Regions:
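Conserved pre-motif I regulatory segment
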Residues: 8-9, 13-59
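Short amphipathic alpha-helical segments, especially helix-boundary/capping motifs
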Residues: 3, 17-22, 29, 67-70, ...
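Long, low-complexity, Ser/Thr- and acidic/proline-rich intrinsically disordered regions
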Residues: 1-8
């Protein structure tokens, strides 16, 4: 199930940069090694790329992570992901780094204060 939450009226939403299907396909294939998205992934990514606030409720293992990882490579700015599971943070950041996305990081309670400061400084 996919639910869209549109807080900003569409007429007032900032214009999303034009991202064509070829760019999306290139990121999917080159960075993530996949040939195609699942239908609901495609729908979620299209909504995000169009600048819509989007909430995706999908089954475990469906590939929700790609729904924010792909747009993060195509849109300007910083992507913030909030997760209650430190192990999941580790897995996702390590997976992104292995794929060459080296600006991925995490902030959580397992880090020493100096590590947090260093990572926050790198984000700025």
């Amino acid at each position: 199930m996919v639910a869209n939450i549109e807080i900003v009226p569409q007429a007032m939403a900032p214009a999303a940069p034009a991202v064509d299907a070829l760019m999306l396909e290139a990121v999917l294939k080159d960075l993530f090694g996949l040939e195609a998205l699942r239908p609901k992934q495609q729908e979620v990514i299209e909504n995000i790329m169009a600048g819509r606030h989007t909430l995706a409720l999908l089954p475990t293992g469906y590939g929700k992570s790609l729904c924010y990882q792909i747009p993060s490579q195509l849109l300007p700015g910083i992507t913030v992901v909030i997760s209650p599971l430190i192990a999941l943070m580790h897995d996702q950041v390590n997976g992104l780094i292995k794929r060459g996305i080296t600006n991925a990081t995490m902030l959580n309670s397992s880090l020493a204060p100096d590590q947090v400061e260093e990572r926050v400084a790198a984000i700025r």
